[in-house]
Every structure is written in C-alpha cells, then in structure tokens.
Amino acid sequence: MLSRSLNKVVTSIKSSSIIRMSSATAAATSAPTANAANALKASKAPKKGKLQVSLKTPKGTKDWADSDMVIREAIFSTLSGLFKKHGGVTIDTPVFELREILAGKYGEDSKLIYNLEDQGGELCSLRYDLTVPFARYVAMNNIQSIKRYHIAKVYRRDQPAMTKGRMREFYQCDFDVAGTFESMVPDSECLSILVEGLTSLGIKDFKIKLNHRKILDGIFQIAGVKDEDVRKISSAVDKLDKSPWEAVKKEMTEEKGQSEETADKIGEYVKLNGSLKEIHAVLSADANITSNEKAKQGLDDIATLMKYTEAFDIDSFISFDLSLARGLDYYTGLIYEVVTSASAPPENASELKKKAKSAEDASEFVGVGSIAAGGRYDNLVNMFSEASGKKSTQIPCVGISFGVERIFSLIKQRINSSTTIKPTATQVFVMAFGGGKDWTGYLPERMKVTKQLWDAGIEAEYVYKAKANPRKQFDAAEKAGCHIAVILGKEEYLEGKLRVKRLGQEFADDDGELVSAADIVPIVQEKLSQIHEDGLNEVTRLIKGL
Amino acid sequence: MLSRSLNKVVTSIKSSSIIRMSSATAAATSAPTANAANALKASKAPKKGKLQVSLKTPKGTKDWADSDMVIREAIFSTLSGLFKKHGGVTIDTPVFELREILAGKYGEDSKLIYNLEDQGGELCSLRYDLTVPFARYVAMNNIQSIKRYHIAKVYRRDQPAMTKGRMREFYQCDFDVAGTFESMVPDSECLSILVEGLTSLGIKDFKIKLNHRKILDGIFQIAGVKDEDVRKISSAVDKLDKSPWEAVKKEMTEEKGQSEETADKIGEYVKLNGSLKEIHAVLSADANITSNEKAKQGLDDIATLMKYTEAFDIDSFISFDLSLARGLDYYTGLIYEVVTSASAPPENASELKKKAKSAEDASEFVGVGSIAAGGRYDNLVNMFSEASGKKSTQIPCVGISFGVERIFSLIKQRINSSTTIKPTATQVFVMAFGGGKDWTGYLPERMKVTKQLWDAGIEAEYVYKAKANPRKQFDAAEKAGCHIAVILGKEEYLEGKLRVKRLGQEFADDDGELVSAADIVPIVQEKLSQIHEDGLNEVTRLIKGL
C-alpha cells in the first residue's frame, strides 16, 4: 500500500517534470554544476525518451558544503564581529520586496532583477542588493539614525563566473550608517571597516579606489557635458577599469555625441590617480575645479576626509582615482571599491573569451572584480518617504558591502595540501570494546554516556551500530577529527570505569587512562581545555592568512 | 546636474510603480505591517491621484530588528551549537530550485509553492522546505551517509498569522541523518535533539506526538480501506488535532466513500494515545495488529525505539498518538511533531474567525501550531536518483525541523518589563570633555583612541560630532548600553592621560580613574573581564527561561 503511494509520487515527479531528456543526456546532467551549461543546452533540445528530472542547482547558484562552508562561516563570523565592534545592530529583511520598491534604483542593471511569478496578490521581486531594502526599512519606520549590518543573499540574473565568485545567488555583508552627522565621519569609519575587515581576512595587497560623485559631476560640467548626458557619460567612464581610454573616448564621441574637446577634457581628469593628498593638491591648484560649485564641495569633503583617514591610519590603502564612477543611480557623494591583483581580467581576456566553448560561465576570461564597495547615498531614504506620501525628510546614508564569494575565492587560493579543515565540531568519540558470545555491543550504554557529554555541552558522537569493531570506531573518530575517545570496555564498564584516550598518530601506543564513570564529564572537560590551549585552529589560521 | 538625475530616478520610481493610491490611502500604508491587509485592499481599488509606492513588506513577511533580532539570533546559535554537538555539518542550498525538483513532494500543499517568473532559462521555484533540497543534494553528490544541519528560510503562500509565528517567509532549523544504520538509532537521536533543543530554549511543557506510518497503514488495511484510498483517509485523520472525531468520521464516510464499519474501526485505533510503553502493550495484545505485516514491522520499530529513548532518558516527553498522520507525501516510518499548550487554537476559534474583520491575517483565531516536527523518509533520495537516470540506491533518511518563528513567539511571551535586551554589542564609549574658545572637540583624537580599542577587538563607539557636550555623550553611551567610558579631558589628554570610568546609575558619583594613554587597551580589557565575570546576560537568561 505504501509502495503504491510512493509509486504515485515518483510518477508525479516524472509527469510534472518540464524537461524531457534521453538517457544519454541524463547521464551528463548528473555531473557536478560545472556541467550545468551542457545540461541546460540539452534541456532546450528535447529528445524522445524517458521523462526525467535533472539533478542540479539552477544556473549561477551552487550548494555549499564541507570545508567550503566552514571557511565561509568563518568569514561571516569575522565580519559580523567586526560590524558589532563598530556598534552595528543587525536587521533581516524579506528575500523578496514589492516590485515597485526596487524599480528605478539600479540603472541599466534593472534588467538583472528576478521577478516572482504573478500567482495572485502582490507583484514581488527578489532583492538585488541589501541597500534598497535598508533604505525602505529606514523610511518605513521613520528611523532618524541607525548603524546596521546585514549579512544575506542577493540575486542577479547576470552571466555567472562561478570559480571567480561571480554568481547569480550570492551573499553581501553590508554595514551602513543612516542619519545626519558631522561631514565625512561615518564615511571614514566605513573606510576603516573596509581596511579592518580585509586585513583580518588575511587580504593585504588591496587598494581602495575612491572618488566623489560631486567632483565627477563638476568635471563633466567643466568639460561641457550637458546635464541630460551626464549619466551616460558617467557609465562610459565607469568602463575605464576594463577598457583603454581610447575605447571609452570613442564611445563618448561616436556613440554618445560628445565633442572631441569635451572627451579630451574629461580624459585629462579621469587619468588622475594617486594618494588623497596628491590628487587633492592637484585639484586644489586647478582653477576650473575650485571655481565649480559642485567640484569644490566634493574637494572640501576630501580635505575633511583626509584628517580622519589619518586618525584611523588608513591613508596608505586609499587611491583617489578620478576614473571611478560606479554604475548605481543612488550614490551622491563618496564612492569607493576595493580591488586586488585578482580583480582584473586575465591579460588575454578577449582571446580567451573567443576560445571559451560556452558563454554560460565566464570564469575563464574574467577577473574576480571588486571584492568590496560602497558609497554615500543621501537621497534614497527620502525618495521612499516622498513616494509613499510621507513627510519629506532627508536621512543621509553611507555604507559598504563585502562580496563574500569573491573574498572566499581569494582565501581558497591559500589552501595548500597541508591545510586540513574539519567540517564537524566533534571532540569526543564514545566507543565500546568487547567480544565473545554474550557481547551486546553496549549501544544503549554508549548512548547514555554520550548523552552525559551532550548535557555538559561537549560535542560527542558514537557509531550508529549495535556491535562495531574497534577499527571501525577509530576510523569514524578519525574521520570526525576527534581529539578524545571515551571507551566502554566490556568488563571495565561493569565495574563503573571508563577509559579516556587521546586520539592521533602520536598517541597510537597510549592506552589511555581508566577513570570512574561518575567523573567522566569533568575529566573530559579538563582534557579538552588542555588540548585547546594551544590556540588557533586551522580555519582561523587560513582566514587570517597566517 | 546631480539633482536632475535624482529627479529622473524619483520619476522613474513613480512611473514604474504598479499601485496607484490617493494620499489618504498612502497615509494608511505608512503604518507598520499590521496594516498590510488594509494597504493591500486599498491597492486593489485604485483611485485617482498621485502615483505612489507602498512602504511595506510583502504579505506574510516582515522585517526583523532590534531585540527581536537579538533573540532570534540567540535561538539560531543555541540550535546550531546543539546540531554541532551531535556531529552535524552544515550545508547551504540555493533559495530556489528547479521547479521539477519540488514537484510531487508536498501533496495538497504544492499549491503553496512560490514560482519565479519565466524570464528565459530554467523554470524555478522558491524552496518549500529544507528536506527536499537536502535529498536532492544527497542524490546529486552520491553521498552515502551524512549528518547535516541547515538553518535557512523557506517559503509558503499560506494564510499568515503573524503574531503566532505563522508566516510566508520563515526559518527552519533542520537536522537530518542520511545513511543506512542500525534501526531506530538515528531516529532516537533526532528525538533526543528535539528534547535537548526545546529544553535549552526554556520550553518545558511540550509533548512529542509520535506515530509510525507503517502502523497507520496497517490500521487502514485492517479497517478495510482500499490501497488507493489510503492517502485521502490519512489526510482526514490528520485533521483530528483540529476537528472532533465525529467531523472526521463524517468526512470519511460521506465525502471519502468509506463504510460506517471501516470508519468506526479506524476510530477505535486513532483514539489511542499514551506512553510508548502503554500503547505498545495495547497494540502487542491486538491480534489484528500483530498479524498485519506492515503494522507488525512498525510495532517492532517501536519496541527497539523504547530501548534507546530510555538510554537518552526522553520517554517522558513522548506521547504515542495513533491520530498523528502528517500531510507530507515523503514520510515512510516514524513521524512526530511537538506541541505545547499554545499550539492549539483558542477554544472559541470559529466564533473569533467569524468576528475577525479581515482574513488577511489569522492570528486572532489560530494557535501557534506545532513548534517542531519530523520523521523518517527512506525513499526520497532514491526517487531523485532514479528520476535523474542514476543507479537506484536507497539512502534512508530521518530528520527534525524546528519552527523558529513559532518558538520565538513563545519566548517573546516571557519578556516582562524588567527585561532589557541590548541590541548592540558596544562595551566602551570614547568621549571628550573640554570647553573654551580653543576647544576643538578632539574628534580625530577620539577616533585614534577608538581605533586602538577596535584593533584590540573591543567594541567601541564615539559620537559622530566635532564637539559634543558631556550630557549628549553620556546619553549616547547609555543608549548603546556601554559599561565603560574612556574620556579624553582637554588638559589630561595633552599630558598623555585618559580617564576610564564605569557607567551606570551606581557609578554616577564616581569620577573614574586617570590612566596613562599608552596602557589604555590592557586597562579596559581588565575592567571588561571583571564586568563580564558575573556571567549570563539578559538574552541568555531569556532564551533559557531563567
């Protein structure tokens, strides 16, 4: 009867499956995610055959497990500790928002938003970042000031480059400060958090590219760009990290209708980069800049910022780079993004792109991109307040976002053959040794002892088998990376005794210590505290780059 | 220029907004989520007026913040610690799956699945639970055995009852064991985890209702239910927690075509409940049961289970209840769910339901429902293996799921006026006191000192203001719940001294201690370790129900 109902379910899986494939295709889809591209193609060319489901995750997404998961959790815990250290509180917003909340915030990237199907009720979309939901939250709850952090997944229907950490579902770790404060103070704290965060993740060779939207806007005015052309010229400038100036200039003049002179004038400025001090000095000596209202405002901000980055001792990480534009609509002041040597695409990227067999994954011909980014957005909260009919109140905001998957891909490169990362937390393995005709295997007895350890907060396991030979139990203990075995000897246990033994190669010849079963918890606790005295574990070493 | 581009964005928000509302309606929508129902209604009756967005989260979802967030994070940390204690590793699967993966797994509840819009590419749906993605993961990676835990959001388009923790987006905290093991061993460990988890969350008055699908199937056979009717009769039995036997009997006979005798026979059995021992004894003495192959298999499992629940000392929490059926298709063995006194709907539920003004939220007339649940599903992994064209291999599974929002709603009830939960982790507030014409406010200096504390891992804040009077700084420190103030006195700081002062009512008259600026880090560390010696903080007390 039961099996009938199961058959029904299996049939229903099969009949509801949208994709028809031949058995040959199915074999291909059972390979790991890397083959997703092939699977997708195959699914679009249905062949005659058995109805089947493809065992894969959707394009641009993946399962996280084993030591990868341990490393990623360690990154989260490092960053959330950092955010808390700076007085951050955390919030959690829904993974989807009303569609209208996301509309008009992301410029050309709006096409990358995932929509939920209209199944009746409200129209919703998956969030594209954590910034817009944060601004919606601040406006909705009339919050005047908050420092909040948020670690959560966001969604973009972009071309994935999985091994470079560019995915369709990925985590952002955001810290934002909302509220009216002394100019550049929360901004410089955000920059300090960038430095502290990356340094504590063992990333040292990074550079914070920084610019100011007002300076950029001033430059465009000076160069003679019309107001209505600013956004499209800004998005041309934004390509300077990937394209040479000549290509960008061509885009400005041939595609975007600017004169040769305008383009050249922009070119003079956007080629500038150096320390805050250097570029500030250059711009301060430029009468065009100092006489342009917007550019002057931006330049004054930079002067203020310099006092604070010096107090935080983070100057050396910052490169004031006038070519940085950033695509998003909502930025109004400082903008910044963090790059490392892995951020840039390979030198022969365009060749590799041509050679790449499939465009489903771009890992072969792209770089990791920026690993963190942020900026000031002073009007976003008020847009929501006004658009919802609330009283207009400006709540200025500034924030940063760490790209965890990209940082993860850098940390992964540090792993060498000697790094062993244990995915379980298990400390103690409870075993039973015995034999003979009347030997039961002490399964309920092992459970009882294990339960005592659990109740004391100690991570403990035992094998799920009535009778297991010592070898199998030691193997299981080793696989779990346990430090200690608690052994129920057939005779010893009857006498109220347990054997406590250190595990590991160097203790192979050590029979351990026979102790009173009544004292097992304090004895194990004492041994564990000795073992853990030596400090850092492998994950911490890896994360910190030690 | 900038403001023009912003105007463009605002216009784009407005023109892209789907919902048109009058200003009056907009005022209503600016109220918190409780008014979501009204807002939705309003949005369905467009009126003439300004284009607007409604500042709300989608129906059945909410933002989490402040002390609620602290409490929920403490629940997660308690449960993940518990899962690790039992040797669990964690995995993370995408929030959406290929639609075909979810098809045919949830019986009548399949209609509650959220679909993603078809924007080209694969058809996907938001996950409905964590169990099906887990089984997909196990099958896809040919995993033979794993203990995994997963704490993540799931999605169901159900009627929400927000204050009872019944939401459309909610967390599940799952622990599952996959692999072929000694009968009932992982099952009893899952039950032990239920007891350990709820107890450590301060929930003591709960009952684990437990049944066995094979016994239930045997009973249906004994009563004369035809094989093809089993699922629908099972789903009638499943309603016994909400409806009286008479109503269920009526459904069986009048709607579902069973004879009076069959229904009465089922009734005899499903009314049985008591301890494992009691009901096991009753069923063992029943020749109908012992001679039915399926029922006998189930009964043997129960006998084995009893040995282990005794070893784990959890018998007293279990009620063997033959009326428990559970709706999901995939269970094959033990099934269980945890209820408390808050689980049941109010006694006058149907009256309240009639009175309730809106059916958008059911909080007024429903109970919290079960707060945790689970069971054995031995065929789900193999369904995926077979349907994907892989070799058929049975990987038996058993698991449990904690309903965090429901547990949260129980813990919230413990909060009384004296409970203060601090949403930030900030320990130290860095202040500057001074005055006079030449007083700068020591902002960069405060930053420098704060940075020293951050670098030593100490949670520290300062006010984001060039000059702030002492009152404002103390207020900010108090708001952040700080224990210590580090004060830069105008003269003292110039002499290389800092003042360290305990905060709080009882230290109001204490001027603190003047120390050398060079020693500030160890001195603050020492003071903090003294302060935290007294142990448990308010959140821990609240979570543990102390």
From Swiss-Prot, chains A, B:
A Pfam family annotated for this UniProt entry: tRNA-synt_His
Gene, per the UniProt record: HTS1
Enzyme class per UniProt: ligase
Binding site for L-histidine: D129, L130, T131, R156, Q172, D176, R326, Y330, Y331
PROSITE patterns referenced in this protein's UniProt entry, alphabetically: AA_TRNA_LIGASE_II
Comment field (misc): Present with 26800 molecules/cell in log phase SD medium.
Impact noted for substituting L198V: Rescues the lethal phenotype of the deletion mutant
Species annotation: Saccharomyces cerevisiae (strain ATCC 204508 / S288c)
GO cellular component, one term: mitochondrion
Organismal lineage: Eukaryota, Fungi, Dikarya, Ascomycota, Saccharomycotina
GO MF terms held by the record: aminoacyl-tRNA ligase activity; ATP binding; histidine-tRNA ligase activity; mRNA binding; RNA binding; sequence-specific mRNA binding
Range annotated as the organelle transit peptide: 1-20
Biological function: Catalyzes the aminoacylation of histidyl-tRNA in both the cytoplasm and the mitochondrion.
Record's keyword terms, sorted: Aminoacyl-tRNA synthetase, ATP-binding, Cytoplasm, Ligase, Mitochondrion, Nucleotide-binding, Protein biosynthesis, Transit peptide
GO BP terms, alphabetized: histidyl-tRNA aminoacylation; mitochondrial translation
Protein name: Histidine--tRNA ligase, mitochondrial
Gene3D superfamilies hit by this protein: Anticodon-binding domain, Bira Bifunctional Protein, Domain 2
